[in-house]
Amino acid sequence: CVRAHLMIYELQDGSPDYPTLVSRNRPDGRPIGWGAISGMVADAEAPGILYAVNDSFYGMQPTIFRIDANQSPAAITDAIPVTRAGAPAQKLDLEGIALDGDGGFFLASEGRPGRMIPHGIYHVNAEGGIEDEIAWPKALRAVARRWASEGITRVGSTLWIAIQREFDDDPAGFVKLLSYDLESEAWGVVHYPKEPTETGWIGLSEITAHDGFLYIIERDNQIGRAARVKRLYRVALEGLAPVAIGEEPPVVEKELVRDLLPDLTRWNGYAVDKIEGFAVDAAGEAFVSTDNDGVDDSSGETHFWSIGDL
């Protein structure tokens, strides 16, 4: 565990490598505050334009951030508050975001029953106002644990949600990918096989649909030299056949796309643990981001970078 570190700098000519993500001022001159970036999604038409949500560290300020990655460093140019009846929405832990195809978004919230935060999906308009709430079915809530929704993506009329770690009814090493049909309101599930680990735990932290595949971030919870698994996998949508909640889920086949650990160490610091955002823009360029936990018990660094075209 890295409890403290010393950073050494050398003055030289050239462009700085860090920060990789900054924010612009609002029209009234006030800065846009941000942190704890979690799930991401790309604008459907404008290359380099992304949207991201913050998680429960800013529980009183759930926000959708607009990111312009066409500049260096990438810049947060707008912050859209998530509201319920005109006030900042409470009892949310936003971990995923998907476009709804009509200018709004679907947001995945990771529940925490002990704090009265429900598991669910929220449909918001372009201004961030909650228009609909999709609750988890009773059979799913009955087996859920704290480490739940960690990404959401839309494929036509189906939403796919990545679950971070095993629920009570999952065998060790397998986690759920949930499906929700917006037309029939039917839930489904498949099993995703995780990598083995001897230290800490491994879970999923993002899911993004692109060009016939579901791209999934799989990571351990280790930092520095202990970090081993920070990877991007993909699962083919063709042949994916979810079954009803409570039935035996089929196991999907995954394919390694990229080891992200070398990316995390290219800034010459220690590898942070929380890769939580992945999006592919309208031009096919893929972007990755990390969650800085709102600088609490963290180095405070947010890394945002492109891995090029998929």
Please provide the spans of the model-predicted regions.
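Sequence/structural signature of beta-propeller domains
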Residues: 1-310
